[in-house]
Structure formats: structure tokens, C-alpha cells
């Protein structure tokens, strides 16, 4: 019985390591502070606002209007992209990563 419990516990701990990578293409980037109001019209969210609210972090609005926050690495990647772009609004990306709850652990991101 102890062996079965140990194997079950080990399996549960290893499950996140086998999480499937998901890709989201042509989705809007929004800062966390503005995410609730921006979900309705994410394309109207501006680069200026995103940079002004950068301390709250960033995420994407999916096609089904769900907001997924980025992990720290994703925040750093999108912040660098936002600082480098001339776009003022309609900030969209292709992003891949492991979704865990309402957070995406970003493995790749490309500003469109």
C-alpha cells in the first residue's frame, strides 16, 4: 500500500513536467492592470498604457476572451518587444508555452 501511495504521489508531482505546449497565434497583448476592461476590445489597448502599467505584468487575450498572464520570462520578453516596436495599438503576438491555470509559462513569443 505504501508503494502504491508513493508511486501515485510521484506521478502527481511529475505531471506538470509533461504539460503540453500550447500555441496562441495573432492574439492581443495587454497588461494585467488593464486586463479586465481590455478583454472586451483588446486591440484598442495601447502600447503607451502597457508600458505605463508594466509593473503589473502582461498577458494575452485568447480568441475565447480568456486572459492568460505571462510568467516572469514572458513578461521580460514582451516588455523588450514593446520597447522596440513603433506600433501604438493593436499589439498582437504569436506565443507558445505551457498553460497552468490562468498563467502561461512562455517558451516563445513574437510580436506581429
Task: List the predicted regions and their residue ranges.
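A short, structured loop/turn motif at beta-sheet edges
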Residues: 20-24, 62-64, 98-100
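Short nucleic-acid-contacting surface segments enriched for D/E, G, S/T with interspersed K/R
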Residues: 76-94
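Short, low-complexity, Pro/Ser/Thr/Gly-rich segments in the mature regions of secreted, periplasmic
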Residues: 103-111
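Flexible glycine-rich surface loops and low-complexity tracts that mediate binding to linear polymers
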Residues: 27, 88-104
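OB-fold (S1/OB) nucleic-acid-binding surfaces
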Residues: 48-73, 112
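Positively charged n-region of N-terminal signal peptides that target proteins for export
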Residues: 1-8
Amino acid at each position: 500500500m505504501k508503494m502504491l501511495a508513493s508511486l501515485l504521489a510521484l506521478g502527481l508531482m511529475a505531471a506538470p513536467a509533461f504539460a503540453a505546449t500550447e500555441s496562441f497565434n495573432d492574439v492581443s497583448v495587454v497588461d494585467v492592470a488593464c486586463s479586465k476592461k481590455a478583454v472586451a476590445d483588446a486591440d484598442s489597448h495601447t502600447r503607451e498604457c502597457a508600458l505605463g502599467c508594466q509593473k503589473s505584468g502582461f498577458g494575452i487575450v485568447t480568441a475565447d476572451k480568456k486572459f492568460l498572464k505571462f510568467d516572469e520570462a514572458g513578461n521580460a520578453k514582451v516588455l523588450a518587444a514593446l520597447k522596440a516596436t513603433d506600433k501604438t495599438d493593436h499589439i498582437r503576438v504569436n506565443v507558445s508555452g505551457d498553460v497552468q491555470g490562468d498563467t502561461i509559462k512562455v517558451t516563445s513569443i513574437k510580436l506581429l
